[in-house]
Amino acid sequence: MAMAAVNCLILVDLQAAFVSGPVAVPGATVLLAAATDLLARARQARSLIIHLQNDGAPGMEDEPGTSGWVLFVEPGAGETVIRKTTDDGFDGTNLGDILAAGRIRRLAVTGVMSEMCVSATARSALHRGLAVVLPHDAHATYDIPAVPGIAPAIPAAMVARVAEWALGDQLELPVTGRDVQFTAAPYGDLGEVSAKPA
């Protein structure tokens, strides 16, 4: 049975440091291919598009104003950029208000990190009664290093798989982003918004 279309795409922390250069996540190439395809089709369908941008602490790769903090994919006209300081894109931001104003009930999520910001944002959306689609190839993270006496190193792909599994049965989990279909946001173009954390 075909999956119902979504009318919103949330791109989580697709910032330069995490998807390009020496500290990019191991699965950056696959992630970017999936994310850019999702974005292109969401734009074509006139879905609501929201870019989350994390404001890291001083000295971190995503510290505001640094090259690593910049969004890797430039937002288009009419797309929303929401800056945040915690894993959950809803926490201290107007993301929930924007989704409500746009009458969004089904959304797709892509980005990093699988077990942190992607998971936290997807879980909050589910708790708000929204249908969430998270393509398996459209999120990524880092390896977890070994800790003597606790566990060996855990590969990033396994971390990502556990993260999506932990979101439970309500999550819709297509194998690839190509399985996701988009439709226009019912409330139309909300206009470009750039919001800093509250």
Regions found by a protein language model. Give the residues of each.
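Short acidic, Gly/Ser-rich segments with clustered Asp/Glu that frequently serve as metal-coordination loops
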Residues: 17-21
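Active-site-adjacent betaalpha module
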Residues: 2-8, 36-37, 60-198
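A short alpha/beta connector and helix-capping loop motif
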Residues: 23-50, 54
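Short, well-ordered beta-to-alpha junction loops that form the rim of enzyme active sites
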Residues: 54-55, 112
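Short, solvent-exposed loop/turn segments at secondary-structure boundaries
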Residues: 22-26, 61-64
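N-terminal nucleotide-binding beta1-loop-alpha1 segment
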Residues: 10-14
